[in-house]
Amino acid sequence: MIMDKSIPKATAKRLSLYYRIFKRFNTDGIEKASSKQIADALGIDSATVRRDFSYFGELGRRGFGYDVKKLMNFFAEILNDHSTTNVMLVGCGNIGRALLHYRFHDRNKMQISMAFDLDSNDLVGKTTEDGIPVYGISTINDHLIDSDIETAILTVPSTEAQEVADILVKAGIKGILSFSPVHLTLPKDIIVQYVDLTSELQTLLYFMNQQR
């Protein structure tokens, strides 16, 4: 199956949603699903579904629908969900602590396997209820050198985000999910995704106001 590596970012962001839908369809015993069924489940139009799928070659035949189990396995493969992906978290403030308690592995094969904060943080040297060890930020290199971790979740204050991101890159991290509302200047081969809760809430309020 041929995959177009130049897919739009909007399409890429929907991949995990498609995967989730096909897993749900499979659990419900649905063997075939039309583009309309998929679109309705996601709240988008069927043309968007067909356009998204066109980037991945022949995923289904017109008039026959999409094979649910086949597509579930396809998206699991491109999202690397056949094997466990270990990630690290840096920043054990309010957001960081909430994420430490979030059970990623209950839904997907991702797990936070270690966390870091300032060496002076009370959590350093301890293990969370879910068995995640918390280390001092000065030991990042020591703990990553023999690990398979290439992804980090960054939940530090915006004033520290760039400095910490630089440390992560030097330690071998290839991808960062940043909750800090600042743009990070990093090498081009480092992938960064931003989660700005304030911006998302403001966007929601804007659309709500437009409906009044």
Swiss-Prot record:
Binding annotation for NAD(+): G91, C92, G93, N94, I95, G96
Entry keyword set: Cytoplasm, DNA-binding, NAD, Repressor, Transcription, Transcription regulation
InterPro entries tied to this protein: CoA-bd, NAD(P)-bd_dom_sf, Rex_DNA-bd_C_dom, Tscrpt_rep_Rex, WH-like_DNA-bd_sf, WH_DNA-bd_sf
Molecular function as annotated in GO: DNA binding; DNA-binding transcription factor activity
A biological-process GO annotation: negative regulation of DNA-templated transcription
Role noted for this protein: Modulates transcription in response to changes in cellular NADH/NAD(+) redox state.
Family: Belongs to the transcriptional regulatory Rex family.
PANTHER family cross-referenced by the UniProt entry: REDOX-SENSING TRANSCRIPTIONAL REPRESSOR REX, REDOX-SENSING TRANSCRIPTIONAL REPRESSOR REX 1
Protein name: Redox-sensing transcriptional repressor Rex
